Amino acid sequence: KYLRHLLLLHPYTVVIYDELEASEAVRWDWLLHSPTQFQPDKDRNMSVTENTTKGFKTVVRQFSNSSFEYSQTDQFVVPPATPAPAQWHLTATYGPCAQNRILTIIQITPDSEQAPAIVRTGDSFQCDDWSIQAVLSPSQPAELIVTNRTNSALFSYSADNPVIDGSMYLRKSPRSSLLYDQSNGRYGVTEQTDYIPASTRAVDYEHKTNP
């Protein structure tokens, strides 16, 4: 099982929440790619890459109850058939476990600005005006709730029904992903259930056999 929720938080923050489950303890590799080299900092669970040509830098921070190690290479796993620009590939390798949760917060800022600090209290993360609550223990039901302290924006992936503008909003589907945000000057709710990405729908891992 794998589920990924990905959010873009205005103006420059990307949030990725991964739920990973296997039938036995396995190694998990989380990959990120960049045209410029990464500068990993294991003590702070972060990595930085800077594109001086285009004038921006990217700070990647990862949080999990499982320990991991960073590595990187500028080689493709499968060499391209035709010449391609050099790329850097960062891998966060998590030790063997049957279940894992990973919260990744990516901040992309101009070179002239400093990425806001992320303050963690348990499973709560404050990032500038955004409050992120992400359950990282696989023994607890998965949950991702994001709110903003300057407006009414809300994202809720949870078993509970959220409170929107002082009233309880009843989900149409259990554990749906619910977004309350402004569009064309008006706030509204968008609700969606999880689905399997098109790139993996044709793979039946349960019944797949080796040739």
Feature names for model-found ranges:
Residues 1-210:
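CBM-like, beta-strand-rich accessory domains located in the C-terminal region of large
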